Amino acid sequence: MGKDTIADIITCIRNADMNRKGTVRIVSTNITENIVKILLREGFIENARKHQERNKYFLVLTLRHRRNKKGPYLNTFHLKRVSRPGLRIYSNYQRIPRILGGMGIAILSTSRGIMTDREARLEGIGGEILCYIW
């Protein structure tokens, strides 16, 4: 049985966000680096840096937290894995779903690389829907 690295990074980020951790360390692969670049560009995380430990590379992510000084802790974002190894979900560019009316993003794996739903619609290409973020 193979390992689902996308589900692993989504779970690590979600757990760290729920436990109010400032940083997360995830395994660095080409797919995870591309997803982290999208998260940085869209403003869901503050910082990402590459770290080497015993010939293994890790990405150390700094999460963006919004704290209301008078009220409770505000959860930053939600992540949901859509396509998984047992059930792949594909979509053409016309049927890519809009997340919260355009407030969230969908990350797609296309023939031109990993990109957001907006970029895929602009380029007119579809692909495998990896996850939703809102």
From Swiss-Prot:
Record's InterPro entries?
Answer: Ribosomal_uS8, Ribosomal_uS8_CS, Ribosomal_uS8_sf
Assigned keywords, A-Z: Chloroplast, Plastid, Ribonucleoprotein, Ribosomal protein, RNA-binding, rRNA-binding
Q: Which cysteines are joined by disulfide bonds?
A: none
Q: What is this protein called?
A: Small ribosomal subunit protein uS8c
One GO location term (cellular component) = ribosome
Q: Which gene name belongs to this protein?
A: rps8
Q: Which family does it belong to?
A: Belongs to the universal ribosomal protein uS8 family.
Lineage top rank: taxon? Eukaryota
Q: Which residues form a coiled coil?
A: none
Spell out the subcellular localization from the entry: Plastid, Chloroplast
Short name of any one Pfam family annotated for the protein: Ribosomal_S8
Species:
Spinacia oleracea
Q: Name one GO molecular function term.
A: rRNA binding
| Complex formation | Component of the chloroplast small ribosomal subunit (SSU). Mature 70S chloroplast ribosomes of higher plants consist of a small (30S) and a large (50S) subunit. The 30S small subunit contains 1 molecule of ribosomal RNA (16S rRNA) and 24 different proteins. The 50S large subunit contains 3 rRNA molecules (23S, 5S and 4.5S rRNA) and 33 different proteins.
Q: So what does this one do?
A: Component of the chloroplast ribosome (chloro-ribosome), a dedicated translation machinery responsible for the synthesis of chloroplast genome-encoded proteins, including proteins of the transcription and translation machinery and components of the photosynthetic apparatus.
Q: Which PANTHER family match?
A: 40S RIBOSOMAL PROTEIN S15A
Cited NCBIfam families: PRK00136.1
- Report the record's Gene Ontology biological process terms: translation
